[in-house]
Amino acid sequence: MGTYFLLLILSTLSGAGAERYVISTEEQWKQWSYPSGGIVEITPDGWVKVGYIRKDINACLDAPKFSYKWLGRKVKGGVKVGSNSGTSKNIIDGDTTTYWAPNPEDDLKDWWVDIDLGRLVTAKKIRLIFAGGRTPFPEFRIYVSKHLQKYAKLPKILEYDLVAKTVKPNTERTFEVNFDSEKDRHGNPLMGRYLQNIRIVFDKKVEDPGLAEVEVITPGENIALKTLERGGKVKYGGRMTKVEQIFDGLIWTGSTVTLAGADWLRQHVWCNWDLGATFWVDAMRFTSEGRHMRWRSDLEGFRIYVSDGTEAPTSPADVWKVDGKDVVWERIADVDNKVSPPRLNFDIKFPKPKRIRYIFFHHYYGTGYWATRASAGGYIWEFQIFGEGFVPGVTLRSPLIDLGKMNNITSISWEGITPPGTKIEIRTRTGERVREVTRYFDKAGNEMTKEQYERLPKFRQGPIKKEKQPIEKYWSKWSPVYKGPGARFASPSPSRYLLIEVNLSSERPDVAPSLKSITLFYSKAVGSRLSAEVNPRTAEPGRPERFKVVVRKRMYEGEVISWHDKWGRKITEERWRKLPSAIRGPVVEERTHWYDEEGNEITKEEWEELKPGKRGKVEHTKDEITGFNRILIKTPSKAEDVKLRIGGRPVPPDSFVVEVREDTLTLDLPKLVFTPEDSVEVEFSCVPYFNGTLFEVFVAGIPGAWQMVPPDPVRKNATTVMLPSLTKGPLIRNLKITPRVITPNGDGYNDELSISFTVSRVEGLRWVKVTLYNVEGRLIREVYRSLGTSGNYKIRWEGKDGSGDAVPPGVYLCEVRVDGDATEDRANRTVVVVY
């Protein structure tokens, strides 16, 4: 009940009287940083949704979105025809009610269709859909190409393979070419056929033909393609080259792989690939069969590992780390390819989808033969990854949020949808200092230096943006994840600047969370640089101890506090306190800040010692503060005998109000406190039970606007009390049974037994039991049985057995038992019953 009350009073401000900073619009969300490439969708009404990876897609539909460089020029995917080009786009628009038809007056040699998918795909089937109400094309041939040159000296001519030809006049509206019989060199089935180009040649004219759609059905979206667009990356050893080319969608580029056998680590034949986000993956494949060469391109073996980023205690070597972290790797492929003929295409399928973000590849087994390899090793020409479902983990980070002035941020809330198996996790960090940076972009959106920008022609110069960035050493670490909407703000406050990080995660591929808004509640700050400490710093568990909590303010260099009347005129503190509330104006913290040229705050003396060219700006800031006249202390048990001092002077008990609950102590002070001279000392007695007991402290000058007071940074763990004896020793302490002899005859004298004890070193709920036995060990009665934790217990026994009957006179054994977090403990005493 006490804990609930603490949370309730600390959350009061989010209900009324607070200012709010709300993030809820499409424009606001689009200023956040998050993986691109369809991983996150921001809707027009301001919802943040997680992207979905599709299965069995038609690769023709988005062909025009892909482009590549070929023979020195940029080429876009799309469709070309030999006749009536004005309606050619209808062939790949996904609409079967539109169609393309060649001009009947054109020669038959112009009746053809060329489709360039813009990237290499794995085709499961090609489907031609002819227009309804028109005559299907009766005779035609279908060719496909991986976009490889047929002749070295004639680079514009591609190598095509005939995959289908009508052997009798076609009369069907749909014609399909299936690639489900594709196999590798050893007869193992493959997922489909690699191709980029489709050519359809019509061999017979009809009067009213119409081709509505050409579809190329693939296993799904190729997750690998947008690695770099999402912010992913790949690092690799020096004897693998240009690994980023294995996921560029082009079969004629790739990575060479030195055949190092088991010595892959020392010879640097590895790559560590970050997809930029986590995905549900059910298959991946790669090919060593690319452009024609005079030497072999196969790998003699390899191993592949995957990870979702789960942290591990250590890594076998630094190359396994991702962003400096050790992660858990799972081996999903171990292939010895020293076979004849060597395999060139590899499909890896999973019985159940796996959460994958990181892929680690290294060569293994053979070392090759230089005469057939030209010292080049093997090749990976293209690597594809497939899956289905919502992206299981997406992280978004806010731009720097500027509240305009120092504020007391009290709580954070959010609105979203979390189906079962999904989570919205939010954390924050705050800071005192930022630097303004200028960023330069060209018209294409590429960032560059100021010098590069100024060298560009005017027509190629893009926007110049000014933005604020944190100066890291003045910023806090990320807070713990907030437990739910309305949680107390966990980062240092008051603050002017903050960052928010959101993680949208799911344990299932068929559901995902979505986020509508985040709201910060804040008010005027009580003041800056408040800190708290508690004394003594050590105590005994389960026994009353006298504690003193001190709250004080420290002034910054160059800081002054000024008082004003309601007309803005500066007055003295003494005069301000004598004014009626309606006439009082603001109390203001005025500060002067000195910076070096890099934006780091320095002292005035350091600034004056710098050469003028190395000096940064001098800034003057003013922040209105409320001061505080309420203090709340979270206590391990009910506080007693409370005393108060302000500025070292005792405050009479009738001059302040005390409210005591089981785990909180609240005081209403006789005046508002602003300055270091008015340090506040609260003395009280209470009983600690847990080692590392934290005395959290809050102050307020506005009803409900509680501001957390951090521990004094000068002293380590300044508000934490240690109980050294709890590091060892029994769970049950201070067991007392009184009286040792009872006479339960109803005369009101020694009629019942009082059993008191302290439970220590138990943090979770555990069974606490008190049981009575006779001298023969037979159970007489279980007097107490309940889930409990560390604390003082007092149990009574009136001398009756489990049936409610009076026990006969004699000696009995009283046993106290506690099932601890890691062990159990028992303690017992004898008692005597007489009549």
For the regions a language model picked out, list residue spans one by one.
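Beta-sandwich interaction modules
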Residues: K30, D114-D116, K156-G210, V322-A371, ...
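Short loop/turn motifs at secondary-structure boundaries
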Residues: P676, L723-Y835
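Exposed low-complexity, polar/acidic, P/S/T/G-rich flexible segments that act as propeptides
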Residues: A123, V206-T227, G368-R397, N407-S413, ...
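Short coil-to-beta strand junction motifs in C2/discoidin
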Residues: G133-R141, R294-R303, P420-I424, E624-F628, ...
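Low-complexity, intrinsically disordered segments enriched in Ser/Thr together with acidic residues
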Residues: T664-F695
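Disordered, acidic Ser/Thr/Pro-rich linker "stalks" and the adjacent N-terminal cap
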Residues: A18-L120, A131-P136, K165-R173, F179, ...
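Acidic, glycine-anchored loop motifs typical of Ca2+
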Residues: K89-T98, E244-S255, K570, E601, ...
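A short beta-strand element within beta-rich, extracytoplasmic domains
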Residues: V121-G133, I200, W280-M293, K405-T418, ...
